Amino acid sequence: MSERFNVADIFGENVFNDTIMKERLPKNVYKNLKLTMEGVQELSLADADVIANAMKDWAIEKGATHYTHWFQPLTGTTAEKHDSFISAPKSDGKVLMEFSGKELIKGEPDASSFPSGGLRATFEARGYTAWDCTSPAFVREGAQGATLCIPTAFCSYTGEALDQKTPLLRSMDAINEQALRILRLMGN
């Protein structure tokens, strides 16, 4: 018989959610991240560095040694680009565990294997992942260990959507813009 547990007790325990962010981020960085999530402002690299460090520390506590920019390409499956928190060993032989805001915000996987990628020269087939801060990061546990999964959008270097998330994010922005326009016309 399998082990029994209360789902309510474990639900979301591997999600870098709002509660975790409030606990681990300085108040001003948390506030700036929330404003970024609402589309009011862009996130500064300094704030991204603080968020990345807090996210890394939390993920390491959960057993993660790697992170991945996780996305849904047009192939209908999920895709991941893995990197390690572990950097070159120090002179004493111990490793550094690092994760920068730049690494959090943007990745550069090869897009040549995705739809229309093979039709272009390799340098033109570049794809970029961009962190979607409106979707929470999470730790996925597996047989090979734990990995911090960072939800991202995936676009070509020309801005063409190469995933299923980017069109949804763009349509949400368009609907929001038009809804606000209509409300203003109605006097609100």
Regions found by a protein language model. Give the residues of each.
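Glycine-rich, acidic/polar active-site loops that bind/position phosphate-bearing ligands
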Residues: 124-188
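Polar low-complexity intrinsically disordered regions
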Residues: 1-2, 188
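Histidine/acidic residue-rich metal-binding segments in metalloenzymes
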Residues: 2-100, 105-122
